[in-house]
């Protein structure tokens, strides 16, 4: 399991605004971790069986107008046994 944490704020976020993704390369392809999740700031990810090597992580947060803010970690996260904690440091406004 890996614990993912983040902060996403917008006065018009959807109730299930957050989607999390992972990829083995920075350009993807991106696989869904969870889609349409509540903006609780924490998700406990049960890693898929056979997932190996470091992964890149992406967070998307959507508002009621359909705008989507996206943040991708610039460096991959190592997958190791034991406790893992990842903190996403921000999502900016959609452009």
Give residue ranges: language-model regions:
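Low-complexity, Ser/Thr/Pro-rich intrinsically disordered linker/stalk segments at domain junctions
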Residues: 1-95
